[in-house]
């Protein structure tokens, strides 16, 4: 398995997971140097190579619930 690393604001983040729900694809990332720096972005529908911010706190909660459900034991 190859580790995918993305550069965001001059910081290197590894992709932890990528999950889809309701026509959205969320990407969960952790800073390689600081694992407490955890971010969630979504794939831009117009350009699949672009990650964009979530729309609001409600969408963040939804994305985190999806992550929690996908990572249950």
Q: Which residues fall in each region the model found?
A:
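FKBP-type peptidyl-prolyl cis-trans isomerases
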Residues: 3-5, 28, 62
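C-terminal structural segments of small proteins and small subunits
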Residues: 46-73
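Basic, polyanion-binding surface patches
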Residues: 18-49
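A general marker of short, structured functional hotspots
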Residues: 9, 22-24, 56, 63
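Aromatic side chains
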Residues: 13, 26-28, 67
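Short, charged/polar N-terminal "headpieces" of proteins
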Residues: 1-21
